[in-house]
Amino acid sequence: MATRDTRPVSWIAAARKAFEDFPVDARDTIVDALTVAADGGMARIVKPMKGLGSGVFEVALRHRGNAFRVVYAVQIDDDVWVVHAFVKKSTQGIRTPRNDIDLIKDRLKKLRVALQ
């Protein structure tokens, strides 16, 4: 049950749309991780995103041979903001592809402006 300290989870529309294409059981696991974030914690499948500033985290889930990723920010507003969801297909090992990093940066910038 949610406490009164639980923060709302808000989504950028494009991130929500991409997330809805994930398999149901992968979505359920990721929603559980986002719920932990909303309660002020950090699930074991979450790690800070390097190079994007403090308060930006990545949910990293390996599921049925795929690498599902959801990026969220906790220091933009009172909400936990999900800014990107994607299936990682990097040929660079564990590194997040540059185009995804650029997209995350752009969405974070636009979100900060929109919420001012």
Task: Describe every region a protein language model picked out.
Residues 1-67, 76-79, 87-116:
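Basic, Lys/Arg-enriched alpha-helical interface segments
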Residues 83:
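Electropositive, glycine- and tryptophan-enriched low-complexity nucleic-acid-binding patches
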